[in-house]
Every structure is written in structure tokens, then in C-alpha cells.
């Protein structure tokens, strides 16, 4: 079986490092790019070079931006008293796609993890406490994933912020829209029952 030339094989190996792309998917993607060099590969390479040169973390919230502050932090129409804490930028983007939250964000950059030796100083938790103190935040919404590390991080943040008197809330957990009880795990059903509200 013929192998791809070395430089193309290197590109395939790099593509395979991306989440959701295994070796076969990466190979197919590279073949499509090679087939459509002018329409796909060249613009993609240019866009990647531009983003690599300009992308950085927002100085205030940790979102990805090409300026000192991201568009959300610069938006004067945002509610300045509400601060939504997320694990990473993908979570921020998911909340923005929903189009419901009109406050500001704080990206932690991960979660506390004893196994991975990730402590509060490796995350943006000290910066979060500063923002609550300095920006007049009235509510911190913890929008962290319902994993053991996510919930450990949420409890830690609540403890850190308790002396400030800020209201700390978390996202409701339970039955997803369109979900059927028979397909849900026991933990999700229990969380939904505990978070029930008047109909």
C-alpha cells in the first residue's frame, strides 16, 4: 500500500490530534484539502496563520479575542452586575449561542483536579475574586459541568466568594428539553426532582 509523502503524512498526523478527528478522518480531510487547494486549503492556511498571530486571551474575562478586551467585555449594553463563570471558551460560546444571558463572563481555563495537579492558582480563580470585589458584581452564576471536578470547583469558588457577600447561583440541572425520563440516568432524574418548580 502506498503511503502519503512525508510532509503530507505530517499534516495528517497533526490533523489527527484535533478532537473528533481520528487518523482516518484526518486523512480524508487532508485529501479534500489537497483536492480543493485553492478553495479550501489556501484560505484555511491563511486564516490559521492570521489567528495564530493575533489570537489571545481577553485581559478581563479570558475569552479568545484579537484585541485587549473581547467584544463581550467591551459591550456597554451587557448587564455588569451578573458574572457567569465557565470552565472554558467552548462553554462561553455555547451560552452565547443560546442568546439568553446578557451579562458578562469569566473563563476559568479548566477545573480543579487533584489527579492532574490543577489547583486554584493554575486557574483564573484569584482573578475571579478580584473581579467580584472590584467590578461591583451582585451575582455570580456558576455554569460549570456536572462532573466531579466541575462540582468540586463550584463548591471551592462558592467558599472563596462567601466573605464578599455576593449571591452565588448555579445552573439548574435536570431533564433536557425533548428528553425522555426512561433514557436518563438516576443522577439526572434526582437533580431534576430536587430542582423542580411551580408549574
Swiss-Prot record:
A zinc finger (C4-type) spans 58-73. PROSITE patterns: TOPRIM (PS50880). Signal peptide: none annotated. Keywords: DNA damage, DNA recombination, DNA repair, Metal-binding, Zinc, Zinc-finger. InterPro entries: DNA_Rcmb_RecR, Rcmb_RecR, Rcmb_RecR_Znf, TOPRIM_dom, TOPRIM_RecR. One of its GO terms (molecular function) is zinc ion binding. Coiled coil: none annotated. It holds the Pfam family Toprim_4. It comes from the Bacteria. The keyword Zinc-finger applies. The keyword DNA repair applies. SMART domains: TOPRIM. GO terms for biological process: DNA recombination; DNA repair. Residues 81-176 form the Toprim domain. PANTHER family: RECOMBINATION PROTEIN RECR. HAMAP family: RecR. Belongs to the RecR family. May play a role in DNA repair. It seems to be involved in an RecBC-independent recombinational process of DNA repair. It may act with RecF and RecO. This is Recombination protein RecR. The lineage of its organism: Bacteria, Pseudomonadati, Pseudomonadota, Alphaproteobacteria, Rhodobacterales.
